[in-house]
Each structure stands twice: as structure tokens, then as C-alpha cells.
Design a protein with these regions (language model features):
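Short, surface-exposed ligand- or partner-binding patches at beta-edge/loop junctions that are enriched
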Residues: 56
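Rhodanese-like catalytic fold shared by cysteine-dependent sulfurtransferases
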Residues: 1-14, 20-52, 61-105
Length: 105
């Protein structure tokens, strides 16, 4: 899913940020849920079964792997094309851990 579509549909989607805590703290999509990739198995119960999950990382590589795994497990899952780098380049907002303007690291 491209950044513009994800931004437009943000309220109906479950945005899952799979990056490391320091990356998430530096900048994330407001309202996204942070579950680092390595914790996903233990925290799978936190994922919705009634909404499309859009997986997010910096470039789309890690989130692409998570997207494939979730789809194989029966979830409606899509990858954010180009990750947060493309999201930010499209001019969409990012928030840091303190609630200020975020950045992609």
C-alpha cells in the first residue's frame, strides 16, 4: 500500500510499526502500534482480525517479511511501500516519543 493511500485510510487501518524501540521513538506514524519484529510471535494476540494490518519499517524490507508471515497466518496484511522513508518524503506527519516532530532513523 502506498503512503498516500495509507494516510487517507489511516483511521480504518491498523498500522503496525515493527522497528526497534529507538527507531520508533525517533519518529513514527501517529496512532501506529509498536511491536518490534522479534516480539511479534509473543504479542500476536494484540493484532486485530477485523482490520487490515499495514506493516511499517524504515524502508519496507523488514515490514515486508512481517507482512508475508501475517498473511500466511491468515491476517489481512499489507506492506507500506517504501516504508517510513517514502511516508516522510510524501509529506505525511511523523511524531517522536515526546509528541514532537519525528524523524526517520
Amino acid at each position: 500500500m502506498d503512503a498516500d493511500e495509507a494516510n487517507t485510510r489511516r483511521d480504518e487501518l491498523f498500522l503496525l510499526d515493527v522497528r526497534q524501540p529507538d527507531e520508533y521513538g525517533a519518529g513514527h506514524v501517529p496512532g501506529s502500534v509498536h511491536i518490534p519484529m522479534q516480539e511479534l510471535g509473543a504479542r500476536q494476540a494484540e493484532l486485530p482480525t477485523d482490520r487490515t494490518i499495514v506493516c511499517v519499517c524504515r524502508t519496507g524490507s523488514r515490514s515486508g517479511m512481517v507482512t508475508r508471515a501475517l498473511a500466511q497466518a491468515g491476517y489481512a496484511a499489507e506492506n507500506l511501500d517504501g516504508g517510513l522513508q517514502r511516508w516522510a518524503a510524501a509529506g505525511h506527519d511523523l511524531q517522536d516519543a515526546a509528541g514532537g516532530q519525528g524523524t526517520v532513523i
